[in-house]
């Protein structure tokens, strides 16, 4: 019975000390489960009875959509985002809203006004961010699957740290209507799951064109493909910036592809040093623009007075480099760099079907450890190129170091999501 499964998850959530959830309404989801059991039209849908957690920057009617910030602490969603409507239409149930870095501006899960999320795979370490609660909820078995958002690695980073699967679809594959945006030219919604097969199913359920999001695209259903004849690219610079212990685990993962019959191709990406400055300069400007609606008049509090330290830092830098006298010096140069980075990245796919490598260059730090902003940003160096270039990228578990999970990142060209998801599935089967 679906209601029994919902009750079991609600009990687990209640007992959990991971701090994965911000808002759970047991009475509401149990009532919806009872109605679902009587709904014969949804019984053959791919997500029928699946219990899904949703990141707290995606609108779900009747739930607190706070972005883990005191700015929106009292805001309750008045509508369902397009992805949530799609989930419900496929027979899924929303169990609650997950914790996250405030306004999705972080890589650790520690900037939430509700306190940090713990990593179920290594309880003394960060789970990664910004989709920290969604990743932790899946890793701790507090739901069947979860939805997160990825602006510069916010699905893939916590998936890697928590030892689960995460997928960032190509830009435009999934509608962002109902998402509280961080940086609109980078943002994408995607799945966090216990296995790669579920990531394929969940991506198919939420993707598709939406009149409410002009960037959204229609794509055919993603199917599993044979990858045995694929060329797998390994980028030297991605490996070089990664800690040796993580690199060793990734090299074992690359051998798995070789054993499957894939050809390994050595590649070089000369713009790796531009990744973080390009990403963050554009991010700051777009985030500053996005937060102007949080003025304390229509809803919530005035953001500059209510937000935390990291969000305020991003707003102030974004304001500064948006000014006319600095825009040409910083923002416009970042846009030029983005164009060069994208051209170079897309060129790599002329030599390889997919690019495989590490997700994050270092192990997650311990909860509460003093880490500088620059050290925090360094977690993103291998994930932001995906968002800068609009390509797709997934993460699957690839070993561990003293019990701390390591994630293998698989990147594909724009709209080659099917290839990436297929490779994730085959890797899991053969690892």
Curated annotation (Swiss-Prot):
InterPro entries with a match to the protein in the record: Amidase (IPR000120), Amidase_CS (IPR020556), Amidase_dom (IPR023631), AS_sf (IPR036928), GatA (IPR004412)
Protein biosynthesis recorded as keyword: yes
A single GO BP: translation
Active site: 55 (charge relay system), 130 (charge relay system), 154 (acyl-ester intermediate)
Reactions catalysed, as given in the entry: L-glutamyl-tRNA(Gln) + L-glutamine + ATP + H2O = L-glutaminyl-tRNA(Gln) + L-glutamate + ADP + phosphate + H(+)
EC number(s) recorded for this UniProt protein: 6.3.5.7
Xref: PROSITE patterns: AMIDASES
Gene Ontology cellular component list: glutamyl-tRNA(Gln) amidotransferase complex
GO molecular function: ATP binding; glutaminyl-tRNA synthase (glutamine-hydrolyzing) activity
Matches recorded under NCBIfam families: gatA
Role description: Allows the formation of correctly charged Gln-tRNA(Gln) through the transamidation of misacylated Glu-tRNA(Gln) in organisms which lack glutaminyl-tRNA synthetase. The reaction takes place in the presence of glutamine and ATP through an activated gamma-phospho-Glu-tRNA(Gln).
Family the entry assigns: Belongs to the amidase family. GatA subfamily.
Full protein name: Glutamyl-tRNA(Gln) amidotransferase subunit A
């Amino acid at each position: 019975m679906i209601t029994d499964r919902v009750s079991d998850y609600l009990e687990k959530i209640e007992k959990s000390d991971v701090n994965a959830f911000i808002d759970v309404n047991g009475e509401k989801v149990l009532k919806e489960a009872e109605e679902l059991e009587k709904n014969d039209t949804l019984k053959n849908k791919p997500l029928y009875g699946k219990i899904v957690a949703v990141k707290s920057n995606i609108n779900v009617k009747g739930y607190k959509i706070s972005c883990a910030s005191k700015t929106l602490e009292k805001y309750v969603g008045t509508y369902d985002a397009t992805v949530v409507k799609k989930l419900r239409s496929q027979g899924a149930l929303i169990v609650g809203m997950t914790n996250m870095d405030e306004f999705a501006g972080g890589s650790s899960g520690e900037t939430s006004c509700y306190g940090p999320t713990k990593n179920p795979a290594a309880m003394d370490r960060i789970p990664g961010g910004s989709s920290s609660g969604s990743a932790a909820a899946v890793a701790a078995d507090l739901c069947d699957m979860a939805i997160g958002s990825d602006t510069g690695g916010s699905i893939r980073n916590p998936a890697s740290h928590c030892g689960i699967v995460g997928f960032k679809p190509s830009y435009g594959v999934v509608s962002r209507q109902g998402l509280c945006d961080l940086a609109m030219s980078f943002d994408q919604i995607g799945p966090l799951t216990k296995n790669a097969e579920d990531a394929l199913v969940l991506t198919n359920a939420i993707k598709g064109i939406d009149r409410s999001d002009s960037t959204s695209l229609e794509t055919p259903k993603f199917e599993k493909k044979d990858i045995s004849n694929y060329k797998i690219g390994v980028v030297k610079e991605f490996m070089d910036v990664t800690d040796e212990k993580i690199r060793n685990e990734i090299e074992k993962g690359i051998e798995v592809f070789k054993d499957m019959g894939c050809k390994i191709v050595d590649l070089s990406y000369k713009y790796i040093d531009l990744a973080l400055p390009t990403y963050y300069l554009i991010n700051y400007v777009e985030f500053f623009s996005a937060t102007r609606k949080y003025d304390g008049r229509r809803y919530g509090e005035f953001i500059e007075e209510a937000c935390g330290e990291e969000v305020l830092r991003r707003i102030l830098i974004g304001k500064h480099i948006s000014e006319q006298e600095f825009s040409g010096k910083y923002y416009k140069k970042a846009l030029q760099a983005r164009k060069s980075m994208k051209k170079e990245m897309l060129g790599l796919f002329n030599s390889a079907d997919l690019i495989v490598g590490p997700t994050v260059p270092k192990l997650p730090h311990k909860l509460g450890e003093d880490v500088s902003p620059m050290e925090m940003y360094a977690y993103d160096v291998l994930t932001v190129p995906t968002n800068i270039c609009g390509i797709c990228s997934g993460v699957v578990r690839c070993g561990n170091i003293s019990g701390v999970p390591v994630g293998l990142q698989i990147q594909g060209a724009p709209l080659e999501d099917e290839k990436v998801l297929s490779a994730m599935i085959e890797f899991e089967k053969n690892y």
